[in-house]
A protein has these predicted regions:
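Extracytoplasmic ligand/sensor domains, especially the bilobed periplasmic-binding protein
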Residues: 2-114, 161-191, 197
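Hydrophobic alpha-helical
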Residues: 10-23, 99, 121, 136-156, ...
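Extracellular/periplasmic periplasmic-binding protein-like sensory domains
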Residues: 46, 153-237
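Catalytic-loop motifs flanking and including active-site residues across diverse enzymes
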Residues: 59, 63, 95, 142-145, ...
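Short, charged, surface-exposed loops that flank catalytic or proteolytic processing sites
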Residues: 224-227, 248-264
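Solvent-exposed, acidic/polar segments of extracytosolic/periplasmic ligand-binding ectodomains
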Residues: 270-326
Length: 326
């Protein structure tokens, strides 16, 4: 086996990372954001792991940058004192790690509150942030705890904007918050996104994906539309595309196809993600993608007849977001 391309399942990935490193088998793309994938300056066989989709640890850095960045052109939320509510599970701990990591380079006051992911009321944490005058809240958590947080903010009449992970970027989930009054014009929820088809380039990439998937389905007894909007199909496609980009770069270099040369090429190449931004694995950094867009949920039904995600700011690299902060 030369490489694992598209490694799926949080538990599966977590259980096999050490084995892949031990054997030196490259892994390109993991369909999970667990913090075990996060590495800074990896060396030796640790370098063979190449995560692509956002890792909580890295995304936390983006959340803080977007929370503090100026509101010009929708780049950020313009926060001056940031409240962080983090669940004590893997998602919360990973995201808050990233927040604290990025805070090392930003002159901003932050108030942290830990909560139990299974709790049904976060009023104590919410009141701490409200009483401290936090004007933006970062929600380091998954969808279910986010619902609890938003309801607690509603009940406390705490009207500030909230920013959270792409894992909660669901029009159904966020639309329900509008319905129950947790989200209002004075208390918006913003979420990141690592894929964006709202741009001409993004839609062109999607149509290329659609064409490839449709052709494969028709050749294999499908309808040609079975996986057009399937997130797992997109994940597998992106994994394969990154791998092919690496093989093409290796071929153009004239180097022999082996693990050592493949790993060198992976570190030397800046990859373009279909429907997304760019990603680099240089210098042993395994941060996954940190070029993310910013969305919010509509406050009224859109043309679809449902609440819709609205693009606030297109995909920007973390470096570009940070450059807007004075």
């Amino acid at each position: 086996m030369f490489a694992i391309v598209g490694h799926f399942g949080t538990n599966t990935v977590a259980a096999t990372l050490d084995y892949l490193k031990e054997k030196g088998i490259p892994m390109v793309y993991a369909a999970t954001g667990i913090e075990d994938l996060y590495q800074e300056g990896a060396t030796g066989n640790d370098k063979v792991i190449y995560p692509v989709q956002p890792i909580y640890n890295s995304e936390g850095r983006v959340l803080l940058a977007r929370a503090v960045a100026p509101t010009d052109n929708g780049v950020g939320l313009g926060g001056t004192k940031i409240g962080v509510v983090a669940t004590t599970d893997d998602a919360g701990s990973g995201l808050v790690y990233g927040v604290k990591k990025q805070a090392e380079t930003l002159d901003v006051e932050i108030v942290y509150q830990d909560v139990d992911a299974a709790a049904t009321d976060y009023s104590a944490a919410v009141n701490v942030l409200k009483n401290n005058g936090c004007d933006v809240v970062i929600a380091c958590m998954n969808q279910a705890p986010l619902a609890t947080l938003m309801a607690s903010m509603r009940d406390a009449d705490y009207n500030v904007d909230v920013i959270t992970s792409y894992v909660s970027a669901s029009a159904v989930t966020l639309g329900a918050f509008v319905e129950n009054g947790s989200v209002t014009a004075d208390r918006r929820v913003y979420s990141t996104a690592w894929l964006d088809t709202s741009t001409e380039e993004g839609m062109a990439d999607y149509m290329t994906f659609y064409g490839a998937m449709s052709a494969w389905e028709l050749e294999n007894g499908g309808t040609g539309n079975d996986y057009a909007l399937n997130s797992y199909a997109m994940a597998g496609y992106i994994a394969g595309d990154i791998f092919i980009q690496a093989l093409k770069a290796l071929d153009e270099s004239g180097l022999e196809l082996n693990w050592a040369n493949f790993n060198d090429i992976m570190e030397a190449t800046e990859f373009k993600l279909p429907m997304g931004g760019t990603i680099s694995f240089a210098n042993g950094d395994r941060l996954a993608v940190t070029s993310l867009a910013l969305n919010t949920i509509s406050l009224e039904y859109g043309e679809s007849g449902y609440y819709e995600l609205e693009l606030v700011s297109p995909i920007m690299s973390l470096e570009d977001v940070l450059a807007t902060i004075k």
